[in-house]
Amino acid sequence: STGEELFKAKACVACHSVDKKLVGPAFHDVAAKYGAQGDGVAHITNSIKTGSKGNWGPIPMPPNAVSPEEAKTLAEWIVTLK
């Protein structure tokens, strides 16, 4: 599956969109914040798998039911969305 296919098939769309903030940040903003960092893909992958809080406001992101490979595919796609 591609990152975009996973984004649509998994729960991501409940809180995120590519270009505007919903409950969670827009993926454009995530790409802008982490895409240029050497560990950006790893950071996003970890956040997808284990959850995240405090980076984008008060609402935490829960851990997501995706495989490590799916999380990495999603993260690699997200950083291309600058």
From Swiss-Prot:
Binds 1 heme c group covalently per subunit. Keywords: Electron transport, Heme, Iron, Metal-binding, Transport. Heme c binds at C12, C15, H16, M61. One of its GO terms (molecular function) is iron ion binding. InterPro entries: Cyt_c-like_dom (IPR009056), Cyt_c-like_dom_sf (IPR036909), Cyt_c_ID (IPR002324). This is a prokaryotic monoheme cytochrome, unreactive with mitochondrial cytochrome C oxidase or reductase. It functions in nitrite and nitrate respiration in Pseudomonas, but it is also found in other bacteria. This is Cytochrome c-551. It comes from Pseudomonas denitrificans.
